[in-house]
């Protein structure tokens, strides 16, 4: 019995302790839950206080019913959204107003979402949609969580991959999710907390939001085109941004004003991948609402268009030109789903589905330029306008993208280079300058954004993997091998927009970085004082020695333009330029040749001295220098003509990379079709290392001429060649081979220049050798008999 009492006492104490722990921890959990609920309620009230358009209101089925029955709705302006089960009411009462049922839709678990408003009131047009892909970066949303018999909690969450995340805690109740479009809130869908997914709502107010199909993300989109004699501008209805800018090729037709020449890549794509060389490239509508038929060739795509034959590989909307983006990586468009407000031959006006953003594209009279006006009805921070991603240009066998901006620093206006971001740090944002304009260039072409109104300080540039925005060159056979997409990443340039609502104008130049067009643009945009934006600075000489060669290149181009005016051919201009330079340098070259001939005549005597004083190298050197002095010979003089020509050679190289007018300029059709690219005598399918798929004849001719010059400049000898002579001959042969390989992939214009220079040098050498009779030259050699 005593044992039972002890056991009972022990059990009682343990039970009491357990109950005490339960009460203690339960109270603590309850207190924690109450604190969390109070915190969530405070956050909800704070958000609702700062959001005028959206509010939580009670409702009843009739005026007689009390509003204290804990039935709540979300009010969006002049609309009510209700969640009910078992049926809906044709009319409800809230805050002194009757609301009529517009439409209802059934969702998971038998929940009805009903839309109420004033009878006869217009609803959102079904033709305006906001397309949201299922996979994209997270973006902020507003969530109204309904809990049993409680006022809904409103908080900020994140939407990604169809799920909602709440940093303040888990989501337990059914929730309505709203998207802030910049002009208010639009229902994004209803959130099922058990399944953790968002379902779209089939309601007029929510039809503005469409979840795009992964397999066909742009199936619902249309494209509109503005065009003139300088460009085609293809605008996407889905994004409101520019899908493509296509520049027509120059032709002999009187109405054609383009200066863009067709090059080999254009012809090769039209033959091997016609779908990728079609223009406009997508199903496009003109101002007469007529479909525009695609044509193969005839245009240059300034912007990358991805793979036109594969919808999934087209350029994503966030990388299209003149889109407005935000977010951590500046890669989230702030509005999608636009409708046409007005469309004629010169102007296209688009408005987002919620009316928050209006875009106006206007063609002007200036070549390759147009105007963009952006109108926002509600302010928002961290908005940026993008330049788009220029197509790839191969300049002297190199890929040379560049982002630059023009600004005033230290009371001086200048053009500044932007360091291109890398894959690891794909976004570069700087706030240390206020660009007057920003340029995104591929070398020969560029997109220039010029704000017409003051904007915040700063600029940005982003790195985009080549597989995301593939270049058209990756379609050349063998596909993605000759020019693999991954090897050619894209870059965008961005300017910030003011955070206040208003109208913002930009002048956009999208075309060749050519002297005549940029000067015309400068004149058209000069202010009352005659000051210009200095767009012509966008033409920059490139290379490590550009600070030295730029004056030479400018001089060469002036002479070439003069000869082009006389002959009508850039190729002949290069040859005539070479002749002029040879005439200018003739006295120096003649003196150098004469000096070298003397050196060759002195060679036997030098060998005799070296043999005599081979044990006294210092004495031999003194005797040789005395021999040079008596005959007025300097060994270095033979190098002077070549040294003087080097700046002109490098200047010509820079000129061919910087002068757009030479791009696509033909000299001998079928062989030399582009002076800024290697000549092509014939080609084949399978690439060969170093040689590629094309046979370039000019570098080989250059090597032959250099070899001939070395043979002509050698002195005729009666006996066997000395070691020094054999060494000189071997060096000459090696130089000819070296220049052949070095110049093999150089532009044909540079090869024409150097080949012409070498050929004229051979002729001058041969003539000089004839004039300088060997007997007379031998008498000019003075020997020190006393040595």
Curated annotation (Swiss-Prot):
HAMAP family noted in UniProt: YidC_type1
Alphabetized, the UniProt keywords read: Cell inner membrane, Cell membrane, Chaperone, Lipoprotein, Membrane, Palmitate, Protein transport, Signal, Transmembrane, Transmembrane helix, Transport
Against Pfam families, the record matches this protein to:
60KD_IMP
Subcellular location per UniProt equals: Cell inner membrane
Q: Name one GO cellular component term.
A: plasma membrane
Task: Describe the task this protein carries out.
Answer: Required for the insertion and/or proper folding and/or complex formation of integral membrane proteins into the membrane. Involved in integration of membrane proteins that insert both dependently and independently of the Sec translocase complex, as well as at least some lipoproteins. Aids folding of multispanning membrane proteins.
| GO BP annotation list | protein insertion into membrane; protein transport
Q: Report the membrane topology from the UniProt record.
A: Multi-pass membrane protein
Quaternary structure, per UniProt, is: Interacts with the Sec translocase complex via SecD. Specifically interacts with transmembrane segments of nascent integral membrane proteins during membrane integration.
**Molecular function GO labels:** membrane insertase activity
Q: What is this protein called?
A: Membrane protein insertase YidC
Identify the InterPro entries for this entry: Membr_insert_YidC (IPR019998), YidC/ALB3/OXA1/COX18 (IPR001708), YidC/Oxa/ALB_C (IPR028055), YidC_ALB_C (IPR047196)
Q: Where is the signal peptide?
A: 1-20
Transmembrane portions of the chain: 170-190, 565-585, 636-656, 688-708, 735-755
- Which sequence ranges form a coiled-coil region, renumbered to this chain? none
First-listed, main subcellular location of the protein, grouped into a coarse class: membrane
Lipid addition (S-diacylglycerol cysteine) is recorded at 21
Can you tell which superkingdom this protein's organism belongs to?
A: Bacteria
Family listed: Belongs to the OXA1/ALB3/YidC family. Type 1 subfamily.
Give the positions of lipid attachment, kind N-palmitoyl cysteine: 21
């Amino acid at each position: 019995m005593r044992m039972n009492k002890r056991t009972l006492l022990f059990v009682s104490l343990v039970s009491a302790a357990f109950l005490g722990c339960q009460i203690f921890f339960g109270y603590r959990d309850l207190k924690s839950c109450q604190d969390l609920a109070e915190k969530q309620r405070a956050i909800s009230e704070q958000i609702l206080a700062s959001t005028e358009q959206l509010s939580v209101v009670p409702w009843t089925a009739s005026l007689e019913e009390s509003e204290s029955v804990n039935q709540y709705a979300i009010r969006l302006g002049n609309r009510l959204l209700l969640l009910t089960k078992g049926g809906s009411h044709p009319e409800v009462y809230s805050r002194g107003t009757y609301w009529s049922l517009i439409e209802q839709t059934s969702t998971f678990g038998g929940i009805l979402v009903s839309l109420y408003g004033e009878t006869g009131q217009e609803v959102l047009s079904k033709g305006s949609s906001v397309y949201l892909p299922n996979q994209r970066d997270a973006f902020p949303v507003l969530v109204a969580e309904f809990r049993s018999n409680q006022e809904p909690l409103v908080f900020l969450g994140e939407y990604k991959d169809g799920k909602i995340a709440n940093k303040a805690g888990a989501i337990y109740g059914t929730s309505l999710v709203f998207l802030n479009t910049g002009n208010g809130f639009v229902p994004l869908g209803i959130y099922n907390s058990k399944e953790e997914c968002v379902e779209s709502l089939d309601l007029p107010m929510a039809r503005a939001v469409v979840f795009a199909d992964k397999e066909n993300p742009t199936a619902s989109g249309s494209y509109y085109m503005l065009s003139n004699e300088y460009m085609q501008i293809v605008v996407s209805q889905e994004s409101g941004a520019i899908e493509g800018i296509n520049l027509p090729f120059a032709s002999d037709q009187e109405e054609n004003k383009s200066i863009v020449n067709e090059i080999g890549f254009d012809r090769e794509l039209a033959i091997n991948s016609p779908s990728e060389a079609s223009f406009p490239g997508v199903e496009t509508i003109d101002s007469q609402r007529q479909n525009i038929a695609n044509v193969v060739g005839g245009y240059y795509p300034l912007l990358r268009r991805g793979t036109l034959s594969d919808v999934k590989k087209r350029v994503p909307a966030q990388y299209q030109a003149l889109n407005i983006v935000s977010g951590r990586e500046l890669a989230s468009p702030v509005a999608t789903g636009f409708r046409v407000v007005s469309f004629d031959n010169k102007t296209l006006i688009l408005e987002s589905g919620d009316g928050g953003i209006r875009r106006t594209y206007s063609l002007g009279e200036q070549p390759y330029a147009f105007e963009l006006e952006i109108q926002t009805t509600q302010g928002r921070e961290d908005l940026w306008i993008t330049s788009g991603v220029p197509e790839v240009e191969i300049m002297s066998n190199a890929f040379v993208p560049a982002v630059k901006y023009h600004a005033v620093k230290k009371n001086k206006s200048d053009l500044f280079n932007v360091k291109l971001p890398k894959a690891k740090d794909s976004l570069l944002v700087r706030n240390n300058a206020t660009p007057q304009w920003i340029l995104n260039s591929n070398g020969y072409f560029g997109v220039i954004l010029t704000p017409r109104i003051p904007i915040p300080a700063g600029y940005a540039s982003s790195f985009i993997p080549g597989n995301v925005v593939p270049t058209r060159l990756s379609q050349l056979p063998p596909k993605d091998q000759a020019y693999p997409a991954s090897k050619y990443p894209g870059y965008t340039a961005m300017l910030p927009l003011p955070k206040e609502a208003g109208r913002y104008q930009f002048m956009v130049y999208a075309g060749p970085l050519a002297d005549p067009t940029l000067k015309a643009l400068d004149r058209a945009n000069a202010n009352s004082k005659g000051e210009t934006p200095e767009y012509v600075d966008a033409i920059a000489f490139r290379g490590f020695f550009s600070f030295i060669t730029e004056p030479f290149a400018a001089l060469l181009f002036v002479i070439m333009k003069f000869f082009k005016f006389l002959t009508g051919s850039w190729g002949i201009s290069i040859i005539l330029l070479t002749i002029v330079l040879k005439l200018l340098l003739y006295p120096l070259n003649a003196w150098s040749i004469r000096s070298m001939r003397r050196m060759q005549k002195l060679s036997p005597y030098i060998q005799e001295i070296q043999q005599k004083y081979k044990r006294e190298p210092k004495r031999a050197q003194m005797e040789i220098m005395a021999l040079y002095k008596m005959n007025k010979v300097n060994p270095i003089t033979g190098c002077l003509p070549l040294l003087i020509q080097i700046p002109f050679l490098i200047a010509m190289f820079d000129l061919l990379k910087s002068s757009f007018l030479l791009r696509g300029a033909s000299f001998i059709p079928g062989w030399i079709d582009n002076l800024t690219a290697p000549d092509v005598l014939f080609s084949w399918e399978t690439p060969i290392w170093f040689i590629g798929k094309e046979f370039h004849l000019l570098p080989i001719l250059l090597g032959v001429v250099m070899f001939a010059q070395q043979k002509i400049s050698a002195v005729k000898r009666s006996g066997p060649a000395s070691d020094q002579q054999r060494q000189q001959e071997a060096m000459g042969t090696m130089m000819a081979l070296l220049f052949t390989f070095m110049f093999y992939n150089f532009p044909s214009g540079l090869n024409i220049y150097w080949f012409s220079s070498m050929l004229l040098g051979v002729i001058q050498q041969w003539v000089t050798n004839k004039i300088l009779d060997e007997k007379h030259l031998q008498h000019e050699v003075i020997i020190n008999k006393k040595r």
